[in-house]
Amino acid sequence: MPAPSLAGGTSHDRPRSRPALSPSRAGDYKQCPLLYRFRAIDRIPETPTRAQVRGTVVHAALEALFALPTGQRVPDRAAELVRPAWERVSADSPDAAELIPDEDLDGFLSEVGKLVQTYYSLEDPTRFDAQACEVYVETELENGVRLRGFVDRIDVAPTGEVRVVDYKTGKAPREFTESKALFQMKFYALVLLRTRKIVPAQLKLIYLASGSILTYTPDHDELVRFERTLSAIWKAILAAGATGDFRPKPGKLCDWCDHKALCPSFGGTPPPYPGWPDLRDAEVVAAKENT
């Protein structure tokens, strides 16, 4: 999955579209229902961090790398893609440009360059072609749950096997964050199962900061069970969405939350609930569950 979107703007100038479930939003709800509300319904802007901007630039550089002919995907050429990738990201996101001042830019680009070069210790991009990079995927399950997200890379072997690849610019995860990363990859595997009618042969997480790889082989029955898990999460979200009852769930990650000032657990008051963008979603799901 790509690094988080760095788009700016206020919650008032963003259109309220029909909600869908992505790996990030599902993770938000599991972590803290109120965080889900702030991000998915109120859409309160968050200031990007240096690490997020760095991850976005790395993703942009690797996407540009795979757009080159196979023989040109060498380390020196990849290094040349770093600055143009930054220029695209900073042009699209004024917040990102402000976060990295001119006097710090060379050091920042050096950080990005090291991560891009680490990639070559894990894969040789001159030996294969990706079928697609930064792929938007979307499907709707039978019970009305809409799934969507972006896949960093999809590879298809000459024999037809599909591999789903995700770049991580942080270090290899511990047990908790490893399960979170695999949740994301199973999500994409399920979308491919429903859209392409295939089970990916491999889910591959590439950790560029630590120079390590995590692979996983899903099976059909496992993805069907995972589909039920997502349906249960969505049912809980819809129930909260109908009433506005998104409760905070304090934990260790609260120290890194942008919304502590609005959280009742820390003495704050959330903004007035704007209502679920499309209450018909709840009605459709309820009708299908009762048939």
Report each predicted region and the residues it spans:
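Regular secondary-structure segments
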Residues: 59-70, 234-238, 242
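Short acidic (Asp/Glu) and glycine-rich catalytic loops that position anionic groups and cofactors
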Residues: 34-42, 59-62, 91-92, 165-169, ...
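Mg2+/Mn2+-dependent nuclease catalytic core
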Residues: 135-230
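Short, polar/flexible loop-turn hinges at active-site or ligand-entry regions and domain interfaces
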Residues: 42-51, 67-73, 174-175, 244-245
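A non-catalytic, helix-rich entry segment at domain boundaries
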Residues: 61-133
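Hydrophobic (often cysteine-bearing) scaffold residues that line and stabilize catalytic clefts
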Residues: 50, 54, 108, 181-184, ...
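Metal-dependent nuclease catalytic regions and adjoining charged, substrate-binding loops involved
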Residues: 5, 10, 76, 159, ...
